[in-house]
């Protein structure tokens, strides 16, 4: 039985999309090399067990930073992570059999919006989720710009020259923003920051008020990232806990 029908529940779905260009390199060992070598895996394990050092002592990303896609912006709108590994489809395919790294890029203020809807009263049935990533001109333009920023850093900075980087994905010959966004989107992944499907506010399209009580109901509160009016310009875990 439906107690309260609110059309905005499940709307306004917002997430951070992680673009994953890949650069093949030389003269440097990456996690790809360790993954396919029994001896290197043993050494890596011993380093961690005995000294708490090595690749197992850090997370999947070795560095993180924020930057502007346009210098005229007041605050950074891109988040970068550097991972010393590469694969085609994250979580679905093995690491590449050559040394490479992945400088991931995330537009932390996307304008694309998706939806999540129930398909059945049975809660065991998975919902219908439509993310609509890169569905706006602005998001595609920023995606293209962000790929170019990474490309410029990797291919033109002195720090990377000893490793002779080669852009495998999306491809050095792709230069226009629209095509870059399309190609990068083929290998992109969520960074697991879905928010805003039960948006907080006082307007008629808001789902909860500033006390997190659902509009039209007195005994239901929603306390998770779905109540965020807008996605945060960074990771969502800490703001949710706060």
Language model features with spans:
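FAD-dependent oxidoreductase catalytic-site/capping-region signature
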Residues: 26-29, 42-239
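Surface beta-loop-beta hairpin patches that serve as ligand-binding interfaces in beta-rich domains
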Residues: 242
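Glycine-rich loop(s) and the adjacent beta-strand/alpha-helix scaffold that form part
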Residues: 1-50
């Amino acid at each position: 039985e439906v107690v309260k029908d609110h059309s905005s529940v499940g709307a306004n779905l917002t997430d951070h999309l992680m673009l994953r260009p890949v650069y093949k390199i030389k003269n440097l060992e990456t996690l790809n090399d360790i993954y396919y070598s029994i001896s290197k895996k043993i050494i890596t394990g011993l380093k961690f067990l005995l000294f708490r050092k090595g690749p197992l002592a850090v997370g999947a990303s070795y560095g993180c930073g924020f930057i502007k896609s346009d210098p005229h912006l007041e605050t950074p709108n891109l988040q970068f992570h550097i991972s010393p590994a590469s694969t085609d489809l994250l979580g679905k395919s093995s690491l590449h059999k050559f040394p490479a790294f992945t400088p991931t890029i995330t537009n932390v203020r996307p304008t694309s919006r998706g939806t999540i809807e129930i398909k059945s009263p049975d809660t065991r049935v998975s919902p219908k989720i439509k993310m609509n990533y890169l569905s706006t001109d602005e998001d595609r333009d920023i995606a293209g710009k962000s790929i170019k920023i990474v490309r410029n850093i990797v291919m033109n900075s002195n720090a990377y020259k000893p490793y002779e980087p080669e852009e495998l994905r999306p491809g050095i010959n792709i230069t226009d923003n629209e095509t870059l966004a399309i190609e990068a989107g083929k290998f992109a992944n969520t960074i697991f920051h879905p928010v805003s499907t039960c948006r907080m506010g006082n307007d008629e399209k808001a789902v909860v008020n500033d006390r997190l009580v659902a509009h039209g109901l007195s005994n239901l509160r929603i306390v998770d990232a779905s109540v965020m009016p807008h996605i945060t310009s960074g990771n969502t875990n800490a703001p949710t806990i706060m």
